[in-house]
A protein has these predicted regions:
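Internal catalytic-core helix/loop-beta-alpha segment
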Residues: 81-117
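Extended hydrophobic/aromatic-rich secondary-structure runs
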Residues: 1-7, 106, 115
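Active-site acidic carboxylates
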Residues: 2-87
């Protein structure tokens, strides 16, 4: 699991500092599934973090390798809390290679991002 915080200045409902947006990265059945290492612990930790953010501040990033067909639907990990329809795909290692994601974040004046996944 990756967990990064930078310059957080917003507060969640518990009074804890949060970023402008939470990016939930690679939490899909390809990587996180029953029988894979730390499945239950990872889902629980990620769901706790998702629950700490307003739903309109949660963005999901699905990994679709550049060689994978676009018509093959990617599935989120079983048990993952889905609170937002903001879903972006990445085809390379960095999610910021997706210009739609970059445009969304820039267009909304994003100053801080928290990553988990």
């Amino acid at each position: 699991m990756v967990f990064v915080q930078v310059a957080l200045d917003r507060l969640d409902s518990r009074g804890s500092k949060v970023a402008d947006y939470l990016l939930v990265i690679d939490m899909q059945s390809d990587y996180v599934a029953v029988g894979k290492a730390y499945h239950e612990e990872l889902i629980a930790a990620v769901n706790d973090k998702i629950a700490s953010y307003p739903s309109d501040r949660v963005i999901y990033i699905l990994n679709r390798f550049f060689w994978e067909r676009k018509d093959r639907k990617k599935k989120f990990a079983t048990g993952l809390l889905l609170v937002s329809s903001r879903i972006f795909e990445k085809r390379w290692a960095s999610c910021f290679t997706n210009s739609d994601l970059k445009d969304f974040l820039e267009g909304n004046g994003t100053k801080s991002i928290e990553f988990i996944g």
